[in-house]
């Protein structure tokens, strides 16, 4: 096995024995084989698109299949085998359609012709030969590095496209790029500059995917408004829902109405409390726990069932394996998988389990500082900057993880001067989300913009402020201090680079899949840099 797509990869180089995420070598091989099969499907789809025969079922399958290969999504070998077989069936169907439409009948490249083994062990063996270090990708290490950057970015795009599609938002251009990008992995004529261009194109398309998801979320549930969310618990039966998918949450709220069950969010579902069409449910109570990497202890202590809607799932303890449920692309062997948004089993389990036997007091936090909320007070923000009440904005955002070095982000926020504002989004916020940082002229100094996909909202805020001050985004009193963990973060980083945003500080470590030569290109063109210490970075930024 060889996998280095996440920040916590072993020794900062790559997982070769077992995944730090809990992924077994057999699962890694099947994920590699699934990507390989999707490359083959994409090669046919690129050609078939010219004849107008790529139906929606191919688009939908491709994004869902790619989503299953993200870190901490699908650990179920049988499920991955089903995806592989389905990819090949669809590929052959598409060849037939292409031929019937007058297109070419034969494809000779290996991914477009491969046949899955008849059994799981055979597939695993096939997967071991088509991984990230195989000749599926370029021999040149720098081109291969850019191929992998693009591949991981495409996985992030696919995740956002899947979320958006569930809410009825899609754009053919997103699907077309996914096919083009995957098929390009087999184009030996592409050089270093071509791959830099493709990586940045991935960033451009990811902006569109996030825009679609934003339209789906706000169009369905309203724009987020400032909302207080309790971190304590209310006496009564309880269900915990984690992940990102707001529609899954909505369906759970509808099906639990009047049943005496309180619904709690976990992880990246926290911002859901700010959406008007969700917070109208009286039994949508509060937030439980912190970021994904703490779930093993937090889930074990939760007195009700847990629903995982999207990444990030870790190996469940035996103590709660019988009360954790997966949905959509998420799967774990032994955990019940919910289909068609039917929560009957979850509700039954919640009524059987004890729930909270007494009220548990806790702090309250504020959420709901999406672009509409922040831009509604833009005049006050602009005045505060002009009057030198507000010196600087920091976007401290991104993924959380288990590495000790991530304490940097807590310390950074704690050391930010009193005349500065911190915007945050994604699960990295759980390092400091419950801190009372006060306000500047009525504007809270800590603003939760939302989920990781709400990077779109943060970009819109930055662009609006740049317009108001009549400067470029890079000339704003704004610094980006980002943490990354998985492939959605890779896609967001590519989006920021596509927009020309410079001086990004990235941590806690740089991606293992970026070679020194590729890093040099990023430094020269975008001045991207690793984090150092909070004190040094603040001094460098503020002087």
UniProtKB/Swiss-Prot annotation:
Q: Where in the cell is it found?
A: Cytoplasm
Query: What reaction gets catalysed by this protein?
Result: A + NH4(+) + H2O = hydroxylamine + AH2 + H(+)
Question: Which range is the signal sequence, renumbered to this chain?
Answer: none
Q: What is its EC number?
A: 1.7.99.1
**What function does the entry list?**
Catalyzes the reduction of hydroxylamine to form NH(3) and H(2)O.
Q: Which family does it belong to?
A: Belongs to the HCP family.
Q: What is the protein's name according to its record?
A: Hydroxylamine reductase
Organism from which the protein derives: Methanocella arvoryzae (strain DSM 22066 / NBRC 105507 / MRE50)
